[in-house]
Amino acid sequence: MPRSLKKGPFIDHHLLQKVDAAVANNERRPIKTWSRRSMIMPQMVGLTIAVHNGRQHVPVLVNENMVGHKLGEFAATRTFKGHVANKKAR
């Protein structure tokens, strides 16, 4: 279920401060964050944000198509190693 429009988008305050500082200083280094729940805002376009997936930080280059989505959608938390082969089918 999507968030109510009257509440507006959610973004962690500390992440917004880091994004504003990076835009003001024209920095290209990745912004490291654990906030997977924060929504991607238009001022983040062009920045690289390292999103934590539970084990490591996954670099995510933000483009225009990602605006309105959550950061966690672009850093997978589970690795699928495939199904085990059926030994009886030989």
Swiss-Prot record:
Record key words, sorted: Ribonucleoprotein, Ribosomal protein, RNA-binding, rRNA-binding
A Pfam family this chain is assigned to: Ribosomal_S19
GO biological process: one example: translation
Xref: PROSITE patterns: RIBOSOMAL_S19 (PS00323)
N-terminal signal peptide: none
GO cellular component: cytoplasm; small ribosomal subunit
The organism's place on the tree of life at top rank: Bacteria
Gene Ontology molecular function terms on file: rRNA binding; structural constituent of ribosome
Primary role: Protein S19 forms a complex with S13 that binds strongly to the 16S ribosomal RNA.
Family of this protein: Belongs to the universal ribosomal protein uS19 family.
HAMAP family (alphabetical): Ribosomal_uS19
PANTHER family per UniProt: RIBOSOMAL PROTEIN S19P FAMILY MEMBER (PTHR11880), SMALL RIBOSOMAL SUBUNIT PROTEIN US19M (PTHR11880:SF8)
Protein name (database record): Small ribosomal subunit protein uS19
The species this protein was found in: Thioalkalivibrio sulfidiphilus (strain HL-EbGR7)
